[in-house]
Amino acid sequence: MSLEFTLRKHGIDPHKDLKLIQNIDFANVASAFGSGTGDYVQLFEPQASIFEKEGRGRVVASIGVESGELPYTVYMAKQSYLNTNSEAAQKFTNAVYRAQQWIATHSPEQIAEAITPYFKDTDLAVLTSSIKRYKEQSTYALNPMIEEKEWKNLQDVMTSAGELKSPVVLDKLVNPSFAQQAISSNSTGNTEPPVKKSTTESTDAGVGAGGSS
């Protein structure tokens, strides 16, 4: 959806002005492009940097930057779970915020070293350049809050793609109390259960905006 939104933003109709290939499984997109399918491809890091290093492609634009700030990655839970496991949810959100702060205050080299065990098949230099690109693009959220403007932008993207029939207010699906508590306590171990403002079966989104390259 964000790709289509970006194309429309630049006056390109994704269904008339080009052939948009959408029948390839996500896990096989990179290999399909590497085998000659398509002229452009939307990839996440570190795959984009791997292709550049191998001379199989070059990053020409960031869809994350072009589409604007979005709550691209979130954590969700049913209200029923939050009602009975608020302490666990708070500790989890605290950890997310502390990780976000750590990323914001450390270099791409330091971050790459820390996450290397999760990318055992990726060269450290490639991993570092991937993180550097994301940091330069402000891809990483600085806190777990989802702001109104980011929520509206997400709905604009979904509406443009025909996936959203009518707007949804932020507080209908997002419970910000856990993120607010994490920020206010600076994640120092305060796990006081946040006050619930709703008993409806809604979801809690725990990570704020982050684009993609």
Q: Which residues make up each language-model segment?
A:
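Short linear loop/turn motifs
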Residues: K19-I21, S129-K135, V169-Q181
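Secondary-structure end/capping motifs
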Residues: N83-K165
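Residue-level detector of short coil/turn "hinge" positions at structural boundaries
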Residues: P14, R58, K165-S166
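Conserved C-terminal helix/tail region of periplasmic/extracytoplasmic solute-binding proteins
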Residues: Q155-S213
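Pocket-lining segment of extracytoplasmic ligand-binding domains
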Residues: F26-F119
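Residue-level detector of family-conserved "landmark" positions at structurally sensitive sites
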Residues: D17, A61-S62, V126, M145, ...
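Alpha-helical structural context
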Residues: K9-H10, E54, Y118, A161
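Bilobed "Venus flytrap"/periplasmic-binding protein-like clamshell domains
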Residues: M1-K53, E148-N153
